[in-house]
């Protein structure tokens, strides 16, 4: 006798590969939830992976300099907000480029674009908004940091295409 397993359909508006009851599902206004899910705000590990090296570098620079200032706190906050926004922009870009693939994979079919929660146009607008906000934050940094951040966009842009080989 064949054993069949049934994977339950995800709840309306949720993403099947995210933890249930996350902060986006519990606290975010309903109209923002698909966009926050598109940015993977319900899964903070990617933001931490961007943010912790930034904070570590800042801490080392402050120790080397021997003093801290209020400006350093703004840089710490700017790194946090920038990491959140750029991680979100990268995930949004990934979902835009993989939209035709995601719809045919059970793990990703419930993501906002293939499930119809967000249109491609809406996702592009969300991507531009996140990038513009992050760029505004980037302007508080020096030219060397700005150049490094701009250079880091290359792997983000090609990543969705590189994983197809």
Which residues does each PLM region occupy?
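Intramembrane alpha-helical segments
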Residues: 32, 36-37, 111-165
């Amino acid at each position: 006798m064949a054993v069949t397993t049934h994977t339950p359909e995800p709840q309306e508006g949720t993403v099947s590969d995210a933890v249930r009851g996350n902060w986006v599902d519990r606290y975010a206004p309903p109209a923002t939830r698909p966009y926050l899910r598109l940015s993977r705000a319900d899964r903070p590990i990617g933001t931490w992976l961007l943010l912790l090296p930034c904070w570590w570098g800042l801490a080392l620079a402050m120790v080397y300099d021997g003093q801290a200032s209020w400006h350093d706190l703004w840089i710490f906050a700017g790194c946090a907000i920038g990491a959140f926004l750029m991680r979100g922009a990268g995930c949004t870009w990934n979902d835009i480029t993989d939209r035709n693939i995601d719809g045919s994979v059970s793990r990703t079919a419930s993501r906002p674009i293939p499930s119809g929660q967000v249109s491609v146009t809406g996702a592009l607008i969300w991507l531009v908004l996140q990038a513009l906000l992050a760029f505004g934050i980037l302007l508080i940094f020096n030219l060397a940091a700005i150049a490094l951040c701009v250079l880091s966009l290359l792997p983000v842009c090609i990543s969705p295409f590189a994983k197809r080989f």
